[in-house]
Amino acid sequence: MSTARQELLSLLARQSFKLGEFKLSSGGTSDYYIDCRTTTLDARGAQLTGKVFLEEIQARAWKPQAIGGLTMGADPIVVAVSVTSGTISGFLVRKAEKQHGTGQRIEGFREKGARVVIVDDVCTTGASTVQAIEAAREFGFNVVGAMCLVEREEAQGRPSVERAAAPAPFVSLFTAGDVRKQHVLQNDETSPSLLAVGATCEICGLLAVTNHPRVRCELHKA
């Protein structure tokens, strides 16, 4: 793992990973949440995001003319990669066509037939990435790859994106497990973050708060 990639992972673990009860865009719930925008919109985080995405793109020899994704999770990633590269343009995909002005859904770079990479911040169901891929192809772009910053590895997100992107590949820079593991390393050993997602107390079944020396809830942790 490159130095920039490790630093980006550490920043995600510190600034973007949260424990608690959260409702996901998929409609489900989770005991953790990853808000990548607190990292991708951070000054240092933006630099690292651009560098690490660009490293991955160059390693795969996609040679895109532009990079884009569905607003708004993709927005800071698009800008970061474009600025870092100095040669790759950016475009944003609206969730719906404008009802005034030009009425277009693709904003920014608009060269039909161009090689493009679709990006997103977090992939859960993959719906936003799929929307962007479909809109890009409908416009006339040649999608050569799809990427996300963090993949949650649930809700059939990867299969959905892979089907939509095919024959182009789908690449995630990190998994939620990677970020959670790094979060553990950066926190005290008795932090709730030590636990696997959904861990419960061995005595009463409530959400556990420690696994040292045993998995227990707040009431039974002593």
Language-model-derived ranges and their functions:
Residues 1-60:
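Active-site-facing substrate-recognition patch
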Residues 2-11, 134-197:
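PRPP-dependent phosphoribosyltransferase catalytic core
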Residues 53-64, 133, 137-138:
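Phosphate/pyrophosphate-binding loops at sites that engage ATP/ADP/AMP, CoA/4′-phosphopantetheine
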Residues 62-73, 147-149:
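Short glycine-rich phosphate-binding loop at a beta-alpha junction
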Residues 78-117, 125-131:
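Short, glycine/charge-rich flexible loops or terminal/linker lids adjacent to PRPP-binding catalytic cores
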Residues 198, 214:
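Residues immediately within or flanking Cys/His clusters that coordinate Zn2+
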Residues 201-204, 217:
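Short cysteine-rich clusters marking metal-coordination/redox-active sites
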Residues 208-209, 221-222:
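Cys/His-rich microdomains that often coordinate metals
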